[in-house]
Amino acid sequence: MTDDGEAVPERAFGWWDMWAAPEDDPREAGGPYSGERETLVRYLRDRRLTLRMKCAGLDAEGLARRSVPPSDLSLLGLVRHLAEVEQHWFRQVMAGEDVTRRYPASDEAFTGATADPAVVEEAWAGWREEVAFAERFVAEAPDLDVLGVGDPEQAPIPLREVLIHMIEEYARHNGHADLLRERIDGRVGQ
């Protein structure tokens, strides 16, 4: 029980459930990779896949559950937030596109994450769209020194730094996702 009397799910922890079975894990097993670009791209890909894995098997209610009151943080909110982060760094900063934010209010990615299947589908569709754009942009960039052109308030930033930032962004939020998922149904690891 929590301090406010809410039931806490039994922790699903053990060596048997700590890691995904290799045949069920879409992430890379590790390098060596063929260079800096491939290393960064694969690490980012694996962090994105980890987010998907942390959300797998949950319905709209589970994805939208704010598991750590009074925070608005939820797994669905993280998906929406990371779609915005992808859009900002790859479409706006790197590609220089003038696009409207997916969620205009500063905290709307989190506060608008409601337990509605249509909201869930829209969030995943938006995230997939932004990830696909980012992957195309990176694949077509001549090298990692390509400079972002879309943020006049910021010094030009090379693609290399954006990729490192995105790995960090996903790693941070995947840590949140670990705790949120454990609070929802006791699932840990993976």
Residue ranges and their predicted role:
Residues 2-23, 27-29, 37-108, 149-190:
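Short, contiguous alpha-helical
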Residues 27-40, 112-118, 122:
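Short, charged, low-complexity loops and linkers
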